[in-house]
Amino acid sequence: MEVIAGKMVFGGDCIAENSEKKIFIPYTIPGEKVEIEIEKDFKDYSVAKNLNIIEKSRYRTVPFCPYYGKCGGCNLQHIEPEFQRQLRVQTLKDAFFREGIEVPQIQIVSGTDKGYRARFQLHDGGLMGKRSNEIIPIDQCPCATEEVNKYLKEIPFTERPKGRIHIFGSKNIASIPDGFDKIVVAEQSEKKQIPIKNNGKKQKKAKARYEGTFSESRSACTVKILDKSITFDALGFFQSNLEVLEKSIPLITGGISGKNVLDMYSGAGTFSVFLADSFENIVLVEHNKSAVVYAEQNLAEKKHKSFGVSGDVWVKYHAETCIKECGNF
C-alpha cells in the first residue's frame, strides 16, 4: 500500500494523507511517499509499518544511533535536527489550535543533540523494543550523559538488575560526593514510608491531601540547577535534559512577580523553587502525591500550599476556596 505521509503528531508518527482511515506511520517525514503495511488495525485508526521510502524528503538523514528503529527510545533521528525543531513547533501549534487557542511566535529552546539524556528506564537490563515487549541489550547510547554511559559500559547486560529500574546520571547530582559516580540506580520495590517534612519540621500526622504518599530515601536524588538544590525521586518523573531545563527556567520564571502564582502539574516543584524568589505565595498542584512530598521539601522555607490532586479535581473542588484564602493569581 502506497501513501503520502502527512502532518506529524506527538510521538513522531506521521498520518497518511490519502487514506480514508487515519493511519499512523513511524519513521517518516511529512511529504514523503512511502510503502506501508498495516500492523495493527483498530476501529478508528491503524498503525502501519514503514516498508520502503519511495520518494524521500530532503530533510531525511542517516540516524547516528545503531539501535535506532530497534529500541523504543528515539523517534526523529531520521530527520535533520533543525527540521525536527520546526516539526515540534508545528505539533505544539496544532495542539493549541485544537483547543481554539491562538499562540504567538514560539521560541525554540534547544541543546545538544547527543549526550544530554540523564534519565533512563531499563527493563531486565535493556531497553524496550519499539512497540514490542522485546528487550534490546545496549552497552552505550549516543543520547545518554557520560554518567549513564559509564554505567552501561561497566555493568554488563547480564549482570544488571532484573525487572524495571530507573537510572538518573548527571554531573549536576549534588547528593553524591565528588569522586564517586554521579548516578542513582533505583529499583522498583515495596516502598518504605518516611515522615513528611514541612518548613524543616517533622509532621506527626500527614495532612489529608498528602495521605497515601511516601518518600523512598534510597531513590532520592538532589541536583544543582542554576545554583539551587532540587530533590526528587528517581523512580518518578524529572526532566531528563538538564541543559534545556537550565535554559528554560529564566525564560519561564524571569520578569514576573506578584502575590500569588499557581504551579499546575508542579512535579517536585522545580519551577516553584525559582518562582518563590519573586512571589509571596506559591500554590502547587500535582496528581502524583509522592512528588508532592519532595515539593514540600524543596519549598520548605517558602510560603506555599500543595495539593496532591489532578488538575481537573483541583479546579472543580479546591480552586474557589484557594482563591478566597490566598487571593487571585
Model-assigned labels for residue ranges:
Residues 1-63, 67:
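Terminal RNA-binding accessory module
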Residues 4-14, 172-329:
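Rossmann-like S-adenosyl-L-methionine
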Residues 14-19, 126-131, 295:
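Short, acidic/hydrophobic/Gly-rich beta-strand patch recurrent on exposed beta strands
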Residues 31, 144, 241:
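Short, conserved phosphate/pyrophosphate- and ester-handling motifs at nucleotide-, phospho-/glycolipid
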Residues 51-63, 69-162:
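Extended interfacial segments that mediate partner engagement and assembly in macromolecular machines
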Residues 104-106, 162-171, 183, 263:
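A short glycine-rich, hydrophobically flanked beta-strand micro-motif that places a catalytic Asp/Glu
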